[in-house]
Every structure is written in structure tokens, then in C-alpha cells.
Amino acid sequence: MNRRGGQTAFAAIARNERAIAAFIPYSSHLTDTTLITHGADLVRTWRVQGIAFESAEPELVSQRHEQLNGLWRAISCEQVALWIHCIRRKTQAGLDARYENPFCRALDASYNARLNARQAMTNEFYLTLVYRPGHAALGKRAHHGQAEVRRQLLAHVRRMDEIGSLIETTLRSHGENHEQAITVLGCETDSAGRRYSRTLTLLEFLLTGHWQPVRVPAGPVDAYLGSSRILAGAEMMELRAPTCRRYAQFIDFKEYGTHTEPGMLNALLYEDYEYVITHSFSAVGKRQALAYLQRQRAQLANVQDAAYSQIDDLAHAEDALVNGDFVIGEYHFSMMILGADPRQLRRDVSSAMTRIQERGFLATPVTLALDAAFYAQLPANWAYRSRKAMLTSRNFAGLCSFHNFYGGKRDGNPWGPALSLLSTPSGQPFYFNFHHSGLDEDCRGQMMLGNTRIIGQSGSGKTVLLNFLLCQLQKFRSADADGLTTIFFDKDRGAEICIRALDGQYLRIRDGEPTGFNPLQLPCTDRNVMFLDSLLAMLARAHDSPLTSAQHATLATAVRTVLRMPASLRRMSTLLQNITQATSEQRELVRRLGRWCRDDGAGGTGMLWWVFDNPNDCLDFSRPGNYGIDGTAFLDNAETRTPISMYLLHRMNEAMDGRRFVYLMDEAWKWIDDPAFAEFAGDQQLTIRKKNGLGVFSTQMPSSLLGARVAASLVQQCATEIYLPNPRADRAEYLDGFKCTETEYQLIRSMAEDSHLFLVKQGRQAVVAQLDLSGMDDELAILSGNARNLRCFEQALALTRERDPNDWIAVFHRLRREASAGLR
């Protein structure tokens, strides 16, 4: 090797690399939450949760915008500056779940593989307050002893605390009212006694593009930060870490738009690449700000083709500045886009510039002083801020609105982990739960409201969504000894294939076919005896003609007589045999009840014996499991509907014994059209949470649901609302009935019907989520329950004689594929 040539090559590399400590302004941690720079500036950082903007009303967005402007006005002075970072980066999303059921395991694995095919992204906001004591104070420090310097520093920290308290109070009310709306970055100690700094972790990410914990150093911070080699080219930087290399390119504003509004840069929150947007704002004095506006107005007035509206705007701005409506400060913007491939990075830069220019800004790649743009990302790095502009605090609040997406709650829910992970158009994961609880609260074991309403027109994917959530619920079966029971009140057999795949029991109640119900075989308890008195009195009621007191007494005596018999002898026909017919009232009672008995007491068979006069009672919800009941036929039979409903609901109440319990109603309007179900649904909406349960209602008929007499309970007592796309949604139903906002209503109408999107609303938060199972044909065939799949399902059951789901599922898929290929 040529020694001289080698030296020249290494010298060239050395010239391109400089020790970065000189570009890092930080000296040390003054307190757990505060850094001090070499220039004695104090630095404190908060993570801001951000506010869900997708469905927020324009009035609320404007109100929050003015709150931010008011905050920046309140804290502004020449000693205060702000750095705000919007970081969009890749994240690992997932839920650890164990499923005993093979189909649920396969569904979850396929679904997660589909989710992982698209990289999950997250948006994070960090607000940094920089407090500059002032040059005079800095100059005096050298002449004071250590005690005086310490006293001054403590005074500055107290001032930081005052400003920080105002920031925290405002931003907590700005978003959801919980502690995690804004969190100060501090230090934490691990089990081995090592102290880590979350502030230094953020700064390390800005310098390396990698998120990794950073320990609190014993020496100077500037010499400790930065574990990547930083190579700056003409328009691109390389951040070379020991294990990988990343490339970065910068964009800044060459020219600003004529106006700003909150959320102007929201389009960037949906991009599929990583970036860091940096804003900094340092207020100037009112005199300097007024002089700036006057100069701007004078320059416009001297232009021959002056825009008079702009001159008037500046005049109004001067008045507003004097009145204290806003402050003016030096503003700096940069966007660092990160990538592993230079060619893809250039495409991402082009996409970002397009998004920015669509909002009226002229964006340009940074090609001069690239390293200055890089180091200007560090808070309090005053010297490297390039292309500064004078901006009002109102404009600053519009560019930094803290708009984000609602991400749900991953852990600490009443039943533990989130029920399911859903994708969103922004790529940010959404952790879905039926329950709605505070993001900062550990609510495990608490019995909270979890009732859920699903509204979607026919063909919008409502059945698939219901069945998918039912499958995801199965993770809670093995979570503890109490287990899980689900009861699905189905219509048109939409859930039958799914429930059978879960190895559940599915009951089809059809006119004229024995139901397997026998209420008289219930255990002889006070509660059951009272129920039987009510049920049998209803059966004996003719044409709304109530029983006489004597008939009630006769019936009660017969019931108690039968309940003392062995269970195998208890039948409706046996009850009839134990009613004496000494009076006309008793004979009339026998005649009425005879319609429900196989032996009607007159040598014939009652027309409705198949409902309750069965040899054995096959209805049993006592064991944890999944149960389905198809009401397609009996819900249209006015004579049998209410008695059957009463019995089903009485038995279901037995299952609500503290175990996790969910009942689901498809086409709920049809079920609650029956008085028994209506009363049950209305009462349980209020009380089911106390029994560790919840109800899930779905319908494609909002008007029928809203017209029910228990509509108020069904609307008001829901923790979660799901709205599927409906371009024909009725304004009155959604706004007045379901209390959606205008923005939410427009979202529901604008979502494409085949987009697999839906709006999830919990409290004041809402998010557009997605359940796209495209390509998962086998799983969809079980979740969808359409007529063709039901035919194949019935054939599969016949061929396998209803054996284990693993047997009939394989045959079902074979038959389905043959039918699709035209072979059957």
C-alpha cells in the first residue's frame, strides 16, 4: 500500500469528520428533568400526547389553536424559547395472546402476519422549554462565589418550574383530561441501580436516528452523546452506527404561505417514512416586533403593484400585536427525512415536498450548511438555526398543533391486554377494547362499562367484524380460572359457522321443531319458582286476558307440586295433570295451557308443545363457553317470541355470575322489538358491568333501534361506538340519535364502502380504524356466514357427522373451493 496515498485517503476522511462535542451545547443534568448548557441556558423537555384531530369539530380545533396561542403569549419573553419535535418513526406493534382454539390461533397468526406486512408507525411530539437567564446574568457569574451561583441557578430552576406548570396545566386541558396528556422527561433507575435519562435518549435519537436508552454520564454530556459517525455530503448525510447505517436529507421552508391554520402539516402524519420535524420559536420584544411589521408594511407600500389587502392585514396585525393578541418571534423549521436506501430517501423527500407545497409553502432541500441544519435540531443550539423567519405565535400554533391519532390502550384495561390490534390509514396501531378507561390508569380487575354499539348498512362488513371480535375474545378464556362465556343472539345464521369453529354450541329455533327447552326442570330455588310463575302465567294468558287470582293460585300450587317430583318427570303435560278441573276457571286454565303441552288434557296434542314440553332441558349456560342462538324464525312468531325470550334471558342471567361475560346481538332492533328483550337490554345496559359483563349491539337499521323504548339506554350506556361506512347515512339519526358530531357524520359518509374502514369512538376520542382481511379467504369464509358458505358448511357437517371442528373445517374449505371452481 502506498503510505503517502493511504495517509491522503485517511486525511480526506478525517477532514469530513469532526468531533461532534463542539456542536452539542449541553453540559450536564442540573436536576433530573433539567439540563444546563455551557452558556447556562436551562433545558427541559416534555412528551406531549397530542390530540385526535380526525373527527374533531372545527370549532374545537380553533379553540385549541387559540389555547396554544394564549399559552405561547403567556410564557413569552426574551428569556424563553421553544423547540418542538414531531418524530415519525417505526414501532413494534403486537399483542401477546394465547388461544386454546385452533381456528382462533390460525386466524390470529394470519391476521398478525398481514399486519406485519406493513410497517407500523407512530407519531411522537416533544416540547422543549429553553430558559436563558440573560447575558447580564451570565457576565456576573464569574464574579460570584459558588454559593451565589447556586442561589441564582435555583432561582432560574424555580422560574422554569413556574413556566412548566403553566405549560402542563394548559396542555392537559388541551387534550384528554389525564396525566399522560403531557409528561416531563426525567431520569429513572433500573433494578441494577443504573440511572437513565429520557431527555438524553431523545437527544441521542436526534443525533443518530436510533432510539436507545442513554445513561446519565459521570462526565460532560456533550462528550457522551452521539454514537454514530456523521458524514455530511452535498445534500445528504450518513449516520453510520456500529450495526447499520442510515441516510438523512433535510427540507426547509424557502417561502411561507400567506396564512396558517391549525393542522397545516397534518398530511405528513400519514406518510410511510421516518422523519423528524423541528420547529423553534423565540419571542422578540414588542418594540422589535412592531418595528418589523412597520418595515414590512412600508416595503409593500413602496411596491407599485402593492397588494392593498396585504397592507391592510399588516395594519391589523400591528393593532393586534399592541393589544396583546399574539407575540412575534424568530421561527425556524427543518424536516429531517431518514432512510436506509439513498434512492428511496430521495423519493420520500420528493413526497414530503409535495405535501408541504400543497399547503402553500415553498419547500426546498437543504444543500448549504447541511450540518448546521442537523445540529439546529438540538434545543438551545442557537447558532445553527438557518433561514429564520419572523412569525406570530398564532402562526406558530398553527404549524405546531400537536395533532395526532388516538391509539387506544394496550395494557391495563379491565380485562388486561387490549382485545385486538387494528390498523389505521396513518399506519399507527390502534389497540381496541370494548371497555373505555383512562390511558394512565391500571384498571385491571375493575368492573367498568364496556357496552358497544356497531352501526353499519348491509354489506359493510358488520358480520365479519362481529365474528372477528368474538374470536379475539377467546384469549380471555384461558386468562384465569373464571373463564369467559359469550352468548350470540344471531339472525340469519351469520355467526353459526364461526361459533361452531370455536367448538361452541349453536341453537336454531324453528317453528314446529322441538327446542330442547324444559323450564320445569330448573332447580327448585325461590328465583326459579318466581320465574316459572311469571312464565306460565304468560303462557296461560289468552288474547291479553289476564288470569284471575284463583287461576294464579291454582297454577302456583301445580308448579310447586311438579317441582317436588324427580326432574325426569317434570313436563308441561305433567303440570296439566296436576291442575284440578273442579271449576270453570280451572277448566279454562287447563284449556289455555293445553296448547303448550304434548298431551293437551283432551286427548290431543297442543299446537305449541315443541316450545317447552321436551323430555330434557338442553339449555345450559353454566359452563364457560361460546353459545349461539338463531332467532330468524321465532322472532317473527308473535305467539312464541316473548315466552322463548323470557326463558333464554332467565337462563342467561345465571351465567352472569362474575365470570367474564359478553352477549352479542346482531340486528339488535329485531331482538329488542320483543318486550322481554327490550326490558332486559335496557336494564342490563345499566347493571351488566357490575357483573363483569358487557353487551355488543349491531344493526343496519338505526331508525328501528332509535325508535325502541329502551333507545336512551342503548345510546347513552355505551363505552364504545363503531360506525361502518354509510354514504346514505341519515343526518338526523346520526347527529340527533347517536350524538355524532358533524365531522364524525361526514367521515362516516365519506369512507368508501369497500375500504374496510370504520370509525371507533370512545368518550371524546375517535379514530378511523381498519379491519382488512383481504387474502385471508379461508378465515373470511368462516367469519362471513353468507348463504353459499352455509350450504357448504351443512354439507361438511353431514359428511363428518359433526365431529371436531378440525375435521369439518377441512372438508368445508374443500367443498367451498369446489363450489367456486364450478365442480359442484
Swiss-Prot record:
<dbReference type="InterPro" id="IPR004346">
    <property type="entry name" value="CagE_TrbE_VirB"/>
</dbReference>
<protein>
    <recommendedName>
        <fullName>Type IV secretion system protein PtlC</fullName>
    </recommendedName>
</protein>
<keyword id="KW-0813">Transport</keyword>
<comment type="similarity">
    <text>Belongs to the TrbE/VirB4 family.</text>
</comment>
<keyword id="KW-0472">Membrane</keyword>
<dbReference type="Pfam" id="PF03135">
    <property type="entry name" value="CagE_TrbE_VirB"/>
</dbReference>
<dbReference type="GO" id="GO:0005886">
    <property type="term" value="C:plasma membrane"/>
</dbReference>
<comment type="function">
    <text>Component of the type IV secretion system ptl essential for secretion of assembled pertussis toxin (PTX) through the outer membrane.</text>
</comment>
<keyword id="KW-0067">ATP-binding</keyword>
<feature type="binding site">
    <location>
        <begin position="456"/>
        <end position="463"/>
    </location>
    <ligand>
        <name>ATP</name>
    </ligand>
</feature>
<dbReference type="InterPro" id="IPR027417">
    <property type="entry name" value="P-loop_NTPase"/>
</dbReference>
<keyword id="KW-0547">Nucleotide-binding</keyword>
<dbReference type="InterPro" id="IPR051162">
    <property type="entry name" value="T4SS_component"/>
</dbReference>
<dbReference type="GO" id="GO:0005524">
    <property type="term" value="F:ATP binding"/>
</dbReference>
<keyword id="KW-1003">Cell membrane</keyword>
<dbReference type="InterPro" id="IPR018145">
    <property type="entry name" value="CagE_TrbE_VirB_cntrl_dom"/>
</dbReference>
